[in-house]
Amino acid sequence: MIKLSKKWDYALKAICYIADRPLELVHIKDIATSEEISESMLRRIIANLEKTWLLRTVKGRNGWVQLAKSPNLITVYAILEAVWEELWLTDCTKGIYCEKKWDCYTTGVLGNLQRWFNALLKMQTLDKIVKK
């Protein structure tokens, strides 16, 4: 079973929460409370999402945030990249040298799985996740 990190899970939950309120400036504290994410962790995640131009923040005492792009332009892959998570299923699909690479039973199937995984993440956009 593939298990992604809490950081990525929180990033996806937070950005979906924001996308579900397209005409609002969303308060960071509201996201943290609603999605049960620590506010300090959420602020770090939001900083990464802002650096990659997925979110726009309004600085101040309250800390407001909104999408920087249309939901149909934000992919799950981009969110995953923004929080600096590894996109590799195994070391061999990452390109790390392995002496058994040419004599391995699983290299082909894992390579295909990696390509399908990446393609799926790139096709899945926020507008498909957050439907009104």
Residue ranges and their predicted role:
Residues 40:
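Key DNA-contact positions within bacterial/archaeal DNA-binding proteins
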Residues 68-132:
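Non-DNA-binding regulatory cores of transcription-related proteins
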Residues 33, 50-51:
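Alpha-helical residues within the helix-turn-helix
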